[in-house]
């Protein structure tokens, strides 16, 4: 039996589809908000933004940490289920994928540090933080990232309704 034909593996894959959409969506929102205010995406020009844009900064930091699979976020749960589903069948590929998570952590933490926590740039001293509509958008995307990270059964039980019949029909 293949790794993809286990409830754990398929739940991980389905959860990854959902969580990738919310995390990446949040990253696009906050990067767009930074660009709208700073008119640049050049990281060396964006140091110290957390002091000027704390709401946008929190959105970026949480999305970045969820993207690299920080425990208590939906990114962690999805990656864990995928790894648990693939390891018994493809141990070497799972280990290689886990190394990819380490690489992702490196570039995400590098970006977060230099953009939001690095030395402040004078050109950014008057940048405004999120407006109410922006803050609501950030919060609405943060909510499922954290809720699914803390209680994944909110979605995995829903996914099982479709996953279990597929496994049964395929002889898994």
Regions found by a protein language model. Give the residues of each.
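Functional transmembrane alpha-helices
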Residues: 1-128
């Amino acid at each position: 039996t293949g790794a993809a034909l286990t409830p754990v593996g398929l739940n991980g894959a389905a959860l990854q589809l959902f969580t990738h959409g919310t995390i990446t969506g949040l990253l696009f929102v906050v990067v767009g908000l930074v660009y709208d205010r700073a008119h640049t995406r050049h990281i060396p020009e964006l140091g110290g933004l957390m002091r000027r844009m704390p709401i946008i900064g929190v959105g970026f930091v949480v999305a970045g940490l969820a993207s690299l699979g920080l425990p208590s976020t939906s990114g962690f749960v999805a990656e864990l289920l995928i790894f648990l589903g693939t390891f018994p069948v493809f141990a070497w590929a799972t280990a290689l994928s886990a190394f990819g998570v380490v690489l992702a952590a490196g570039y995400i933490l590098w970006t977060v540090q230099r953009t939001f926590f690095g030395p402040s740039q004078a050109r950014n001293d008057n940048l405004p933080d999120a407006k109410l509509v922006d803050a609501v958008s950030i919060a609405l995307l943060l909510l499922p990232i954290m809720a699914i990270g803390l209680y994944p059964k909110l979605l995995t039980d829903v996914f099982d309704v479709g996953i279990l019949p597929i496994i049964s029909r395929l002889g898994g």
